[in-house]
Design a protein with these regions (language model features):
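Beta-strand-rich interaction surfaces with strong enrichment in secreted/lumenal proteins
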Residues: 13, 56, 98-100
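Short aromatic-glycine motifs in intrinsically disordered, low-complexity regions
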Residues: 7-19
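Compact, glycine-rich, soluble single-domain proteins
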Residues: 52-77, 90
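Catalytic strand-loop segment that frames the active site of acyl-thioester-processing enzymes
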Residues: 20-60
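HotDog/MaoC-like acyl-thioester-processing domains
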Residues: 2-5, 17, 33, 102-106, ...
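Hydrophobic beta-strand-centered segment that forms part of the acyl-chain substrate-binding groove
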Residues: 2-6, 73-111, 135-143
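Conserved positions in beta-strands of structured domains
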Residues: 26-29, 94, 99, 111-115, ...
Length: 150
């Protein structure tokens, strides 16, 4: 797996099974195997899943933002050679805090850090920021399944 930075949308498609409109990561800018990763999500007015915040402005729903954080974390986990043929499953979220809405035109910087990694399960801490300000943070549990058919 080629992890020459920055990873663009096409390189990310070779790692994750997600496709448009559910692939929520546009670019990977930083990567340390088994430690941390930083990705970018550019929020556009053309997003299919925009909702409206309390002020009537278009906003990215918090659940979609959480999924974007999980996808960045999945790239970190799948980059490990022994996980190339595995499929990550989002198993749970803990202590998630949504700080402020994310609007079209925002560039979301997403960081995921490994807290614990075992052969089939793990825990990541994720933080998303816009202009250096935290917009969401929390920990995510994931499980790894095999893609081979028995």
């Amino acid at each position: 797996m080629d992890l020459t930075l920055p990873l663009d949308y096409q390189a990310i498609e070779r790692i994750l099974p997600h496709r448009y409109p559910f692939l929520l990561v546009d670019r990977i800018t930083e990567f340390e195997l088994d430690k941390r990763i930083v990705g970018i999500k550019n929020v556009s007015l053309n997003e299919r899943y925009l909702s409206f915040d309390g002020n009537g402005r278009a906003a990215l729903p918090p659940t979609i933002l959480t999924e974007a954080v999980a996808q960045v974390g999945a790239i970190l986990i799948l980059a490990k050679p022994e996980n190339h043929q595995r499929l990550p499953f989002f198993a749970g979220i803990q202590r998630v805090r949504y700080r402020r809405p994310v609007h079209p035109g925002d560039v979301v910087e997403i960081e995921a850090v490994v807290l614990r990694l075992r052969s089939r399960m793990g825990l990541l801490k994720g933080v998303a920021r816009v202009n250096g300000v935290r917009v969401v943070e929390g920990t995510m549990t994931f499980a790894l399944g095999d893609t081979s058919k028995s």
